A protein has these predicted regions:
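Conserved N-terminal diphosphate/IPP-binding helix and adjacent helical/loop segment
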Residues: 1-86, 91, 95-96, 100-130, ...
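Membrane-spanning helices that line or support transport/gating and their immediate boundary helices
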Residues: 95-98, 147, 151
Length: 261
């Protein structure tokens, strides 16, 4: 029995439960951070602030992918922890994305690099405040990425199911990062000037930075945690047919996963 309403897959109750798992993990990490030094407290505070809120789409697709495939639900804490770990991965990408895009805000707050740039100015720190903000944003993004892996691998889930899901998580991390590289390349104008090449590149950006990363891989991870990869491997596409476009990948997968054989 799942404690959340499938007709409202990203309900406030679901989002609050994901947030609780994230905060619990950060509370545990606080002991490690405090032992290293008080200078790191602002970084941990920023991790709390920037992982708060959000739609929690990736955790939701992971959770409900599991629900669609599982004969019996796994222990709720383990499933929620594994699903919530994807939010750390997402926020890591957002922190770095904001830095590359020179964005000033994120989720109603100053972006991480702007936040620490301002903190440097208030403290009258040495050197350029902008550089300090950029440096801390890179490091916080890296830390969030490492925490995502740590939170996932420490989830109280059967070892064989974590092992089955791990290659999918590896692919998710690689694809979103490569999708970001494609995005930067597309904006640079270095990928060729003909419209067909440009359209192909944009399609791959959408595929790997959005559709696969947001929907397909999280769903697949949930299915793997359900121990149902054998059934589902033949059902989802590894990539979208060119004639259908990248966004169709997620649609095909969701349609196929709704009626398992």
């Amino acid at each position: 029995m799942y404690p959340f309403d499938p007709s409202s897959p990203v309900s406030a109750d679901f989002r609050d439960s994901v947030s609780a798992r994230i905060l619990s993990f950060l509370d545990d990490e606080k002991r490690v951070i405090d032992a290293i030094g008080a200078e790191l407290s602002p970084v941990l505070d920023a991790a709390r602030d920037y992982t708060a809120g959000g739609k929690r789409l990736r955790p939701a697709f992971c959770y409900w992918g599991h629900a669609a495939a599982a004969d019996q639900p796994i222990e709720p804490t383990g499933l929620l922890q594994a699903a919530a770990s994807l939010e750390f991965l997402h926020v890591s990408a957002l922190v770095h994305d904001d830095l590359m895009d020179h964005s000033d805000t994120r989720r109603g707050l100053p972006s991480v690099h702007r936040h620490f740039e301002a903190a440097h100015g208030i403290a009258h720190g040495d050197g350029p405040a902008e550089q300090f903000g950029c440096d801390i944003a890179i490091l916080l993004g890296d830390l969030l990425l490492m925490w995502s892996s740590q939170m996932f691998t420490s989830a109280p889930v059967k070892a064989d199911r974590l092992a089955a899901a791990t290659p999918l998580l590896d692919a998710m991390r690689t694809e979103v990062t490569c999708g970001q590289v494609l995005d930067v390349t597309s904006q640079s104008g270095m990928a060729g000037s003909d419209s067909e090449s440009a359209l192909d590149l944009v399609g791959r950006v959408v595929e790997y930075k959005c559709a696969s990363y947001t929907v397909v891989r999280p769903c697949q991870i949930g299915v793997a945690l359900a121990g149902a990869l054998t059934v589902y491997n033949r059902r989802w596409p590894t990539s979208a047919p060119p004639s259908d476009g990248p966004s169709n990948t997620a649609t095909i997968f969701l349609a196929s996963s709704a009626t398992p054989s």
